[in-house]
Amino acid sequence: MQFYDKVLDESLDIINWAFAKNPSNFYSAKGDESKLTCEVIKLFDNDFKYHLDRYKYYQRHKTDPNLHREKCNSILLYLEEVIKKNDWITSTEPSILYISIMPFIRQYRIADCDYFSSMDHKGVTILLKEFESSALFKEVMQKHEQWSKDKNNGAYVS
């Protein structure tokens, strides 16, 4: 995302910018919730994303996908424990935590739906189902006709 004076190139920067622009629509964590939110987001943005990429694209990274799948799963099991101890995470209002980590969890599930379904993380699964059925998700993930250079004379049409 580019502005006149700066570029936001990290997903978390873009999310923070969006929350600052319209804070009333989102659940805002306070105190210990805010600290935990930052910790979990960093865990997903760094460790989970690292292992997710190596799980999904193991041929490109020349790695063992099962090792990285298990690393992701242990992070999800940690999140499961966090959810059990912190019911605010499952608030009906979207939060910065929710917006930041659910796309990663969704990608992980899509990589192997059967494996994901067999894992013991009920809270994570419920959270993902709520995310995918939310109005926010449906609005953002609308399907569009595939862009074609020939069809659009090489121009991008929004």
Predicted regions and their residues:
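GST-like fold's C-terminal all-alpha helical module
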Residues: 40-133
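Long, amphipathic alpha-helical surface segments
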Residues: 130-135, 140, 151-154
